[in-house]
Amino acid sequence: AVLGALPDIVQDQMMRLLEQLGLKNVFVLPQVKFDDDVSIGKNTHFICVQPFLGASYEEMVRRGAKPISANFPFGAEGTTKWLWAIAERFGISKAKFDTVVAAPKLRAEQAVAAVADGLRGKSVFFFPDSQLEIPLARFLAAECGMELTEVGSPFIHKSLVHADLEDLPATTQISE
């Protein structure tokens, strides 16, 4: 299961990639159609697409579902790590994974590179607002070369953002 609302085109692309990896029984919550039949239990594996889904995360765990931990899919690197966490959970080979994601990853890297030059070396400060701050900070530092002055977040759900926290520069000041 994938938790989090995505634009239709992004969800379609994601589902296509997951299918190409060989994953068949994938569903997204919230559902596109009200009458889609899904059940959640001990055989359900899930991953979140946004860091502010703490209550949904906790409910899935309460129902016995197994979380997949990963960076959030922000930028080429974050998205690749997010997809790899899913592939790895289901035993998909690195060779198959690399083949499936090669072209979309290259497009993503080119898109990020087109804006990164204008951001490289600049500093950014995140006021606590939406819980998106930590993965956005990771993306801007790692993929765009920005300096992080401080990263504030109204709440840090470590089960959700620990991978992005680990990838922040060691000197990053974090406030909650």
Write out the residue ranges for each language-model feature:
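An N-terminal assembly and electron-transfer interface module characteristic of large anaerobic redox
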Residues: 1-176
